[in-house]
């Protein structure tokens, strides 16, 4: 606000404007600056893998069977207020991470706290925290954001201890926040990836995330000739060289 006030003092045209109007301008500028700074912090703290992701740039014509109406509805972020989850599934390179980050950016624009993390990295964080005595603090770091993006969900089958970590995290988030799951496996395969009948927690974990969830499965009409979304969005360094 101080900079804006000095600009007014140094600009002769502002001398013709009543003080009340000039003060209102300063308030508007300060309000806009604070909103912009808050948005920048939210995006920075989210740690997006693809911070350039934009919901308007999602490709609907590259052989993906995407429901544009559903994606547009999810972009309004009403699912966050409803504490509903989102499952994004599909093969490697189909655009799951890009889409999830685009939804995350929309959440930030509406000032919802958001966090992106790969599930393998999250589990490592919790393992280290357990050994250092900071488990609850680190668990809260991922339990508290209103939107949590879990990339590479169940890429590897979790150990028994990791299953307990996943259960604790999702139990804390249940009916309080929204989680976006990105997985190469279809939802029907998650139970087996969690240990199936051999795991006492598999049912409990699925129960805490499946209710009223939205689901987007990115498929290929012609897998043999379809190109990777990393190529479409120019995200693959090798493809840019």
Task: Describe the predicted segments one by one.
Residues 84, 111-113, 144-147, 175-181:
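Loop/turn-to-beta-strand initiation segments
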Residues 2-50:
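Interdomain "pre-motor" coupling segment immediately N-terminal to P-loop NTPase/helicase cores
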Residues 83-99:
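Walker A/P-loop nucleotide-binding motif
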Residues 75-83:
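Phosphate-binding P-loop
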Residues 104-117:
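Post-Walker A helix-loop "phosphate-sensing" segment adjacent to the P-loop in P-loop NTPases
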Residues 1, 44-66:
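Dynamic helix-loop-helix/coil hinge segments at AAA+ ATPase domain boundaries and subdomain interfaces
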């Amino acid at each position: 606000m101080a900079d804006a006030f000095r600009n007014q003092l140094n600009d002769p045209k502002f001398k013709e404007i009543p003080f009340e109007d000039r003060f209102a301008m300063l308030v508007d500028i300060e309000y806009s600056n604070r909103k912009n700074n808050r948005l920048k912090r939210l995006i920075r703290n989210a740690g997006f893998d693809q911070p350039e992701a934009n919901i308007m740039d999602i490709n609907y014509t590259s052989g993906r069977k995407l429901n544009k109406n559903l994606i547009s509805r999810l972009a309004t972020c009403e699912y966050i207020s409803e504490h509903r989850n989102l499952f994004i599934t599909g093969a490697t390179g189909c655009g799951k991470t890009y889409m999830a980050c685009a939804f995350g950016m929309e959440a930030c624009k509406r000032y919802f706290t958001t966090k992106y993390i790969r599930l393998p990295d999250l589990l490592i964080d919790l393992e280290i925290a357990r050994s250092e005595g900071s488990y609850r603090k680190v668990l809260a770091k991922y339990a508290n954001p209103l939107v949590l993006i879990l990339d590479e969900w169940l890429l590897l089958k979790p150990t028994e201890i990791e299953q307990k970590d996943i259960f604790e995290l999702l139990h804390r988030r249940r009916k309080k926040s929204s989680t976006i799951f990105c997985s190469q496996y279809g939802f029907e395969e998650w139970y087996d990836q969690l240990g199936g009948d051999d795991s006492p927690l598999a049912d409990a974990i699925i129960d805490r995330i499946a209710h009223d969830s939205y689901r987007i499965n990115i498929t290929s009409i012609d897998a043999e000739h379809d190109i990777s979304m990393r190529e479409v969005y120019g995200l693959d360094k090798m493809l840019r060289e």
